Curated annotation (Swiss-Prot):
Pfam families: His_biosynth. One of its GO terms (molecular function) is 1-(5-phosphoribosyl)-5-[(5-phosphoribosylamino)methylideneamino]imidazole-4-carboxamide isomerase activity. Gene3D superfamilies: Aldolase class I. HAMAP family: HisA (MF_01014). Keywords: Amino-acid biosynthesis, Cytoplasm, Histidine biosynthesis, Isomerase. It is found in: Cytoplasm. Its main location: cytoplasm. Pathway: Amino-acid biosynthesis; L-histidine biosynthesis; L-histidine from 5-phospho-alpha-D-ribose 1-diphosphate: step 4/9. GO terms for biological process: L-histidine biosynthetic process; L-tryptophan biosynthetic process. NCBIfam families: 1-(5-phosphoribosyl)-5-[(5-phosphoribosylamino)methylideneamino]imidazole-4-carboxamide isomerase. This is 1-(5-phosphoribosyl)-5-[(5-phosphoribosylamino)methylideneamino] imidazole-4-carboxamide isomerase. The gene is hisA.
């Protein structure tokens, strides 16, 4: 199970939104390239990058910053926000992005997601961003008429890298993840699930580690890293030791 630090880009700055609200922006670093280097130096094995301008407008406003981040670090990047065409997906793969995250088009253009997953197996993730169980699109500004569970079920036919499940009500709040919603998604999905939203403490990470064998393979952490609630290096070590202990205990069961 990976702990994946997040960088959200808005006007070229590293920010966090509260529950996806573009009117509640906290700027954490005016140099997102430097921030990416910091996360790699603290042991991150993957970076979660979101183009908030792209998610809202569909325009690649932050491409220069994205390219600079890619050049500055060696770990793989998964990128989402405003990717709504095959041409845009190919542009991002061409500059070295490891995975792209599709959200809005999974609802509006499902055939495009299907085509991309065939052309780029295990390199497409789908973001299921839900509010009260229903999927939101267009940078969380529009509510769809499909439930998160129904969408996860529809995606079972595709060879995805992961489903990134975000509970909008908890995102940016530090109040803990919606564990029940995550377990329901993981139970219904054949694809691996990455948890996102609400992580506020190492205790929250530990609570999700219990479900590593149920299909939750990663946890995205944002605000808690920036405000010091979680130290990335400590969190990675804690989770690693916990999972090793669980594996050791499981092995002991077979030896008894």
């Amino acid at each position: 199970m990976e702990i994946i630090p997040a960088i959200d880009l808005l006007n070229g700055k590293c920010v966090r939104l509260n529950q996806g609200n573009y009117n509640e922006v906290t700027k954490f670093n005016s140099d997102p390239v430097k921030q990416a280097e910091i996360w790699e130096s603290k042991g991150a094995k993957r970076l979660h990058l979101v183009d908030l301008d792209g998610a809202k407008t569909g325009e690649p406003i932050n491409d220069l910053t994205i390219k600079e981040i890619k050049k500055s670090i060696t770990i793989p990047i998964q990128l989402g926000g405003g990717i709504r065409s095959i041409d845009r997906a190919k542009e991002l793969f061409d500059i070295g992005i490891d995975r792209i995250i599709l959200g809005t088009i999974a609802i509006e253009k499902p055939e495009l997601v299907k085509d991309l997953s065939k052309e780029y197996p295990k390199r497409i993730a789908v973001g299921i961003d839900a509010k009260e169980g229903m999927v939101a699109t267009r940078g969380w500004l529009k509510q769809s008429e499909i439930s998160s569970l129904d969408l996860a079920k529809q995606l079972n036919d595709l060879d995805l890298a992961a489903i990134i499940s975000t509970d909008i009500a908890t995102d940016g709040t530090l109040k803990g993840p919606n564990v029940q919603a995550l377990r329901e998604i993981a139970e219904i999905s054949i694809n691996p699930v990455i948890a996102s939203g609400g992580i506020g403490s190492i205790a929250d990470l530990i609570s999700l580690a219990d479900f590593a064998d149920e299909g939750i393979e990663g946890i995205i952490v944002g605000r808690a890293l920036y405000d010091g609630s979680i130290d990335l290096k400590e969190a990675i070590l804690t989770l690693k030791n916990l999972l090793l202990q669980d594996a050791f205990n499981e092995k002991d069961k077979f030896l008894v």
